[in-house]
């Protein structure tokens, strides 16, 4: 009897919530075990001193097929970012973006001293080629590193340094662009076809919405799993849960003995928030810092988009991807 099955999902992030959604459709009543006090995983938002702070600068790309399948975009009250970036060269911001989706970016992009005219033409051609590829074909294409891929396409070192490196370092969370070219093509396609969006009430609105759809799922918060052994789940507080099936929707290496798959090499960044007297961008642009000596990779003003929680001053989000020796 499927209704009597005890199915536990370890992790209340996006993967865990989607797993519960699918199980409910088959009549299963899953139990989600979440180590923290709420759902969301890496998609969390805090309100501190009246400011709305996402835990990490994160955006939702409008053309993510899975997002379109499981989310109601209208209810998220999504705020649009400009389809481009402000790139700081010698301290001066230079606008660079997609004039096909925002005509106001045409002249700034044409005259942007970030690479050659040939580079800009190659970006347009690459965009056209990738839009014609299906996602399935992208992930079947022979892969190299993103860095090698860009050089193979024929981009100059200057455009790679000024645009591709800081932009994709902020996405891949690594500064050498060693990430697979398949992932580069996928992300490039998503940015080329859609827009970067942030929910008005913060990125945590995404998991909150997914949770609201779950009618048969039980949630156990502050329930950290330390070991999964056959039909038993052991929690950090010593509690032992009996289970028929367990879905691990989080880092599994510590809780499962003799895991056949190799340990995951997680990448990370540091996200800092500052208040400032003014926003230096007229519109919601991502700011890129292509300076090798700079600790900062990219910046964004959350106060440049609509929010239900705004403090007295402008809010600046700073992302650090580089490894460093600075302490807290």
Regions found by a protein language model. Name each.
Residues 49-137, 146:
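Dinucleotide-binding Rossmann-like beta1-alpha1 core, especially the glycine-rich loop
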Residues 24-48:
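Glycine-rich FAD pyrophosphate-binding loop
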Residues 5, 57, 243-244:
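Local beta-strand N-terminus motif with an aromatic residue
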Residues 15, 38, 253:
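Conserved Rossmann-like nucleotide-cofactor binding loop
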């Amino acid at each position: 009897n499927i209704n009597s099955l005890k199915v536990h999902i370890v992790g209340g992030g996006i993967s865990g919530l989607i797993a519960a959604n699918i199980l409910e459709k088959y009549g299963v009543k899953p139990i989600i075990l979440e180590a923290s006090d709420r759902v969301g995983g890496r998609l969390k938002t805090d309100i501190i001193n009246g400011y709305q702070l996402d835990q990490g600068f994160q955006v939702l790309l409008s053309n993510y097929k899975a997002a379109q399948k499981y989310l109601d975009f209208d209810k998220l009250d999504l705020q649009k970012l400009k389809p481009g970036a402000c790139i700081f060269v010698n301290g001066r911001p230079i606008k660079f973006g997609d004039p096909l989706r925002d005509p106001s970016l045409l002249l700034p992009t044409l005259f942007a001293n970030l690479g050659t005219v040939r580079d800009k033409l190659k970006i347009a051609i690459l965009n056209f080629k990738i839009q014609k590829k299906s996602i399935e074909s992208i992930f079947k294409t022979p892969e190299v590193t993103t860095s090698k891929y860009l050089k193979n396409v024929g981009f100059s070192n200057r455009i790679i340094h000024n645009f591709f490196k800081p932009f994709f370092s902020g996405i891949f969370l690594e500064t050498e662009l060693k990430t697979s070219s398949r992932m580069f093509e996928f992300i490039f396609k998503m940015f080329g076809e859609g827009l970067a969006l942030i929910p008005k009430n913060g990125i945590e609105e995404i998991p909150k919405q997914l949770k609201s759809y779950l009618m048969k799922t039980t949630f156990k918060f502050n329930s950290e799993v330390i070991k999964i052994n056959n039909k038993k789940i052991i929690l950090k507080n010593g509690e032992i849960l009996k289970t028929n099936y367990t879905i691990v929707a989080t880092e599994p290496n510590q809780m499962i003995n003799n895991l056949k798959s190799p340990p995951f090499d997680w990448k990370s960044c540091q996200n800092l928030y500052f208040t400032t007297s003014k926003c230096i961008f007229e519109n919601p642009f991502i700011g890129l810092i292509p300076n090798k000596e700079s600790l900062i990779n990219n910046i964004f003003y959350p106060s440049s988009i609509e929010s239900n929680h705004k403090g007295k001053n402008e809010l600046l989000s700073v992302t650090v991807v580089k490894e460093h020796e600075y302490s807290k």
